[in-house]
């Protein structure tokens, strides 16, 4: 006899008056079990669109300067060291901001945390139009770059809105379409500059006015998040805390369980050489092609844009691949997928540094490299939601922050000053990708196994997630959401577990928002 699936799918939860609360099918944790890309169904898909669009706008703001760097460089008299320092500043600002954002998501929710961060960093974008010195350029890039911490709220949001079989895809699309801003801005800013210049502005004035476009985009996105976003399927954090439907956790507990989970540290390291590499390329690729192959500003922008624009399918593709591998091989499939794809990306990065003698070969390899390194980002956040439930936000922040740390270190070591030629730095960066992906082999979940070792006999997901709660907290039912997540994650054990595995239940599963 065929076993019944453990995850309970509900075609819209009945609310007062017998009307369905959701237009989308949900599981017992009220998370959507489907992903309707072109829908705006609230709260799941509306929050998805707010998450990726706000992150997209932050990416546009952060990398609005590099496409206009030849003009900014001449106006402000920037040296190679100034440019390198500013590039480092643009990605270093978000290191601690991402950790803070993860904690804020755990404590106050992704909606308020995201909108607050975006509004606080928007003035720096507008100030880009009035800078007069290299130090001013460095400062605006630093403070604008802090907005990249909105990535953490986007990933936390998707992990809160979509069930385990769809979380990799949701995280991949939200992150990928957000990162798309890094490519779109390579086209946008030169076009805006040209339009303003043709109207009659001098080059000195035109590039300054152009910065108002990313500033306005960022302002609008923050307002949209507040107006249309929702923290959780059951409501916003404030409401859920007041009604007692959600346990209000303490910072100390959230921090302790995040810092003591070694899986989060490994993912932070590997993400440092997937997303961190992507940030580094966003900073150097435009100038590299402009100087190395003597192309014009628009052509260099088009080439650089092709790297970032690949995110429209590459990172979502990584998330989709993670979910597909999970459906066949469970968590072990997700881990193998991450290691394989990121390692191939490292090899292609080495090749990119070697073929610098050929313009056509460099462009072709860069495009191929972009697909693999960005897909690795999607595969990473196909795993992150399963590391911890109590400290999901901070684990996401640690991983995201690792991406920025990787970018800072890589840019400082290989692209700062004149120690290495850019093509040599790219080659060494590829070797770092390969080396820093190896620790994925050490990630092990007792209930699901790891890359090289199977699961421990008798271990369950419920047991794994409940360890984050004390006996007293479990008695009060504070771990109810973790238990529901464990039950809905049964397929992470592979096909045999998904088809026949019946995890132990200690907390009744229902469709209420309690404990969400």
UniProtKB/Swiss-Prot annotation:
Cellular localisation: Cell membrane
**Induction trigger:** Circadian-regulation with a peak in the middle of the morning and at the end of the light period. Isoforms 1 and 2 are induced by sucrose in roots. Isoform 1 is induced by nitrate in roots, but not isoform 2. Isoform 1 is down-regulated by ammonium, glutatmate and aspartate in roots, but not isoform 2.
Which parts pass through the membrane?
52-72, 76-96, 112-132, 142-162, 172-192, 209-229, 265-285, 299-319, 335-354, 367-387, 395-415, 425-445
**What cellular component GO annotations does this protein have?**
plasma membrane
Q: Mainly resides where?
A: membrane
Remaining remarks: Plants silencing isoform 1 of NTR2.3 have impaired xylem loading of nitrate and decreased plant growth at low nitrate supply (0.5 mM).
Q: Give the protein's recorded name.
A: High-affinity nitrate transporter 2.3
